[in-house]
Curated annotation (Swiss-Prot):
There is a cross-link at residues 6, 11, 27, 29, 33, 48, 63 (Glycyl lysine isopeptide (Lys-Gly) (interchain with G-Cter in ubiquitin)). The modification Phosphoserine is found at residue 65. Residues 1-76, 77-152, 153-228, 229-304, 305-380, 381-456, 457-532, 533-608 form the Ubiquitin-like domain. Its main location: cytoplasm. Belongs to the ubiquitin family. This is Polyubiquitin. It comes from the Eukaryota. InterPro entries: Ubiquitin-like_dom, Ubiquitin-like_domsf, Ubiquitin_CS, Ubiquitin_dom, Ubiquitin_ubiquitin-like. CDD domains: Ubl_ubiquitin. Pfam families: ubiquitin. There is a cross-link at residue 76 (Glycyl lysine isopeptide (Gly-Lys) (interchain with K-? in acceptor proteins)). For the sake of clarity sequence features are annotated only for the first chain, and are not repeated for each of the following chains. The record marks 54, 72 as: Interacts with activating enzyme.
Amino acid sequence: MQIFVKTLTGKTITLEVEPSDTIENVKAKIQDKEGIPPDQQRLIFAGKQLEDGRTLSDYNIQKESTLHLVLRLRGGMQIFVKTLTGKTITLEVEPSDTIENVKAKIQDKEGIPPDQQRLIFAGKQLEDGRTLSDYNIQKESTLHLVLRLRGGMQIFVKTLTGKTITLEVEPSDTIENVKAKIQDKEGIPPDQQRLIFAGKQLEDGRTLSDYNIQKESTLHLVLRLRGGMQIFVKTLTGKTITLEVEPSDTIENVKAKIQDKEGIPPDQQRLIFAGKQLEDGRTLSDYNIQKESTLHLVLRLRGGMQIFVKTLTGKTITLEVEPSDTIENVKAKIQDKEGIPPDQQRLIFAGKQLEDGRTLSDYNIQKESTLHLVLRLRGGMQIFVKTLTGKTITLEVEPSDTIENVKAKIQDKEGIPPDQQRLIFAGKQLEDGRTLSDYNIQKESTLHLVLRLRGGMQIFVKTLTGKTITLEVEPSDTIENVKAKIQDKEGIPPDQQRLIFAGKQLEDGRTLSDYNIQKESTLHLVLRLRGGMQIFVKTLTGKTITLEVEPSDTIENVKAKIQDKQGIPPDQQRLIFAGKQLEDGRTLSDYNIQKESTLHLVLRLRGGMQIFVKTLTGKTITLEVEPSNTIKKSKQEDGRTFLTTLSRKSTPCACSWA
């Protein structure tokens, strides 16, 4: 079959080939026709560079298809592609590569289809048919990759003159790109544009979606109309650079001006003013930098990085640092940001306290690592940790130490990994992020160490409303801990919770395993609605039992209390109040049983039954009885006493009312 090969000069070569020809074969045919060595040829089809060992049919190249021939005129080069997630991709390219070809390389590396890619350089979107050299993209240049996540949308840009410009954009467009579109429409250079949305100046490197700018949103365009000012930048070598700037210039923009003058890439620059490192997205006016102010330029010798410092309040501080920074330096940066004196700071990483004279690289602290900041509130103290084997460990701690830090100290002493440790104090499991002082743990307090020997399990907690809560627990969890989990899920304070299992109320200091509570067991949750009260239970033998109960106790729970006191199994108990048999699932308050009320306990000896008693007035009374009931036994119904004096003799019965 015939195929065509088009060169960058516009010349078209016709080749006779077969679908089974390799790309290497095709290059040999081009060499025969044009004299171009195969190692200087790169063939492109459908935006992809063709590999020598593959065949035409592998790429679905059919008769009269057109390949594009790109010559390796100058050696290759590396460029970088930065995504919105911050990931940087390195690509091997040539100046003659088309943008389409670059997108194909990105697809090969990242799997992103070319039609979902938009490449930005110097604030401009790159067109598929153009080459890298067309855009003056040189070695080690950085392109920005924006994904076409959703279809385009319209936004409006309103100028101070009242004119409104309509732009076609995508949520993933950068502000820099929007300014380029405004330049295309209005001829205003991007560096003279400031875009405002919701009262904020928009930063070039951010996207419309970062600012939640949606379709038909209106941005405000402010021009940099007033004249600039001079500032000075002093380097560590003592050299002073003079820059023409405006108060609205971003730090990023100032760094670009320094690059223009001195050739120092922005990512190697750190600018300091009034002891603070300046952040790229902020403006000179944000830092109150005025005319003839002097900034200090510090170079990132081995490439800076960002780390995070998390305080005990949960606040996270972002710091710009270098691997060679000492811990002392880092504390100084924290002081600049938060005002905390270095001697009150303790920095923790991977469970270890960091020493002032050491560097971040000494501790293998890398970009985006998180340090924990603990304040030295008071001097140190000793606490004890008791294991289940009876061994007692002595630890030197401070009230401001986190539980995580205590676990790290235990690991140092005993070799037990922190994730296998559970620390208990006053019946509560201690949470990693909290401090000893949060739990009022003082000098010479004793913590209990429980090992996570087996994985967790699920249990269920059923409320009186019928709702079932699922909890992830461990057999060694205390009841207090389970109540804390219920509070997390349902918001019920632990002191209002009573947990029942197998008819018993569970005590806070005991564990689930103490009660033989296993996976998928169901506990019953009873709320302490009002304070407790005393009631009486009268048996048929005349004995009276006193019980401590709450109005929210279920009848089932009352029976459990009777079992605890008298040893009578709940299924043999029948409780009567105001002539009614009480149902297990109902509460005392359901029956209006109040303090010092008396219930009657009837035993189910051989299974109960119902009988009917018909009065002379025609009324029928239903009674719950047992075959063992005597005829002379008195029963209460509707507040009256029904006395039967039926004789077991063969004579007709005589009935009387009292």
